[in-house]
Regions:
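Catalytic alpha/beta core of large soluble enzyme barrels
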Residues: 77-82, 91-98, 103-184
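Core structural elements
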Residues: 1-15
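Amphipathic, positively biased hydrophobic alpha-helical segments used for protein targeting
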Residues: 12-14, 52, 119-120, 131
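Residue-level marker for well-ordered alpha-helical positions
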Residues: 5, 39, 86, 168-169
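Internal maturation/activation junctions in enzymes
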Residues: 16-108, 179-182
């Protein structure tokens, strides 16, 4: 599945953090991410045909993840559809989807290294991390360090995982697979 990387940087540059997150911002971001992934796969189905077993998926029935999430999350962020979900659901019902599953949130260590991003949806453990692979040792500094160093929240500075858990709850509204959550 396609995941999210660099969430810590996104939070820092938007003046929010894991302990006291702007859940409306997270909701808006995750909704657009999910919508455009589903839309791209639905458009591919028009070009190349729907995936085998499309009629056995929720997508084939025109059902999207933001219709099946645990509604208790609405207590954190009221449900709002900013994107044209009605049109997308109609398209899914008519032409199907090319990929039966699209989204999964995992640590994304390799992708983060290649793109000089923070790991997936996780808070950084330090401003500089040392990562080792078969190719050698890599020292990686969080993106935008000089500009956002006072905005980043490091994992060990969190007093409680409550804000992090709330972020994960909001993200799950838009995901069709799973989330790898770490509450170190």
């Amino acid at each position: 599945g396609i995941g999210i990387i660099n969430l810590a940087f996104f939070l820092a540059k938007n003046d929010t953090n894991y302990s006291n997150p702007n859940l409306n911002l997270i909701d808006e971001y995750a909704e657009a991410w999910s919508y455009y992934l589903i839309k791209a796969s639905a458009d591919l189905a028009i070009e190349q045909g729907a995936c085998p077993g499309n009629n056995e998926t929720k997508y084939g029935d025109g059902i999207t993840p933001n219709q099946t999430y645990k509604k208790d999350v609405d207590d954190l962020v009221p449900h709002t559809e900013r994107m044209d979900w009605t049109g997308l659901r109609k398209q899914l019902s008519e032409t199907g989807i090319r990929n039966s599953t699209l989204m999964a949130l995992m640590p994304s260590e390799t992708s983060a290294q290649i793109s000089n991003s923070t790991n997936g949806i996780e808070p950084p453990r330090a401003f500089v991390s040392v990562k080792q692979s078969k190719d050698g040792v890599l020292k990686q500094v969080v993106p935008g360090f000089y500009r956002y160093k006072n905005k980043y929240e490091l994992l060990w500075d969190q007093k409680s995982p409550e804000g992090y858990i709330k972020i994960m709850a909001v993200l799950q509204k838009y995901i069709d697979q799973g989330i790898s959550v770490n509450t170190s």
